[in-house]
Amino acid sequence: MITYIEELSDEEKEQLTGIIRTLLAQTFLLERKYDKKGSRFVFNKEYRICCRHLEFLQEYFQVAGMELKENTPTGVIYLVGEDAQALRLTKLATIYLLLLKLIYDEQMSQASTSVNIYTTLGELNERMGSFRLLKERPSPTEVRRTLTLLKKYQIIEILDALDELESESRLIIYPSISMVLFGDRVQELLQSFEEESDGNEDEPAAI
């Protein structure tokens, strides 16, 4: 492992350090991300760098008690393991995550040609109401904070301005959501929220 690092140029060492920090901070790396300026999906430079050093990085994280996995069909590289950063989410963030996963699975089952799925804030809120998952409508501040958190973890991309959120506000659901939640777990959590009669809605949950 030390020999591998010594053979890298200073620029490559700097890139490798950056990739390690990024993975520790956000868990996921996406092969393609949406570029709002160009209104299209573009290749992620960090993903390419990670692929180039994948074997070394897998050994590096294994020593630290984590596993670095690559899901080639969906273009996602991600960390798993007890020592990997868990997604600490508020109740609203957890609910949004569950509903995003439901929407993602439904659209993918309709023979979608893309691993990235589009939805709207309005659809999210409609689903939340139909499942009766919250007693009160979340404030705009809570919604903005929640969407920003999910964006940080590379779960979604927010296509419209955060300060102008409306029902028509568009979101992209990235394939990384399938690495966070599996079908049975989604239904289990949804049922627990439906049955919940009281409790602190801002209590963090680890996913």
Residue ranges and their predicted role:
Residues 62-70, 147, 151-163:
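A short, conserved structural fragment
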Residues 49-57, 135-152:
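Short amphipathic alpha-helical interaction segments
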Residues 170-207:
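Short, amphipathic alpha-helical interaction segments positioned at domain boundaries
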Residues 76-81, 157-184:
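Accessory beta->alpha helical hairpin/"wing" motif in late/C-terminal subdomains of nucleic-acid enzymes
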Residues 34-44, 111-129:
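Short acidic, hydrophobic short linear motifs in intrinsically disordered regions
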Residues 1-82:
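Eukaryotic partner-binding/assembly regions in large regulatory complexes
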Residues 108-116, 134-138, 159:
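Short acidic, glycine/proline-enriched loop segments that cap or flank alpha-helices
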Residues 10-15, 81-117:
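Short alpha-helical segments that sit at the start of domains
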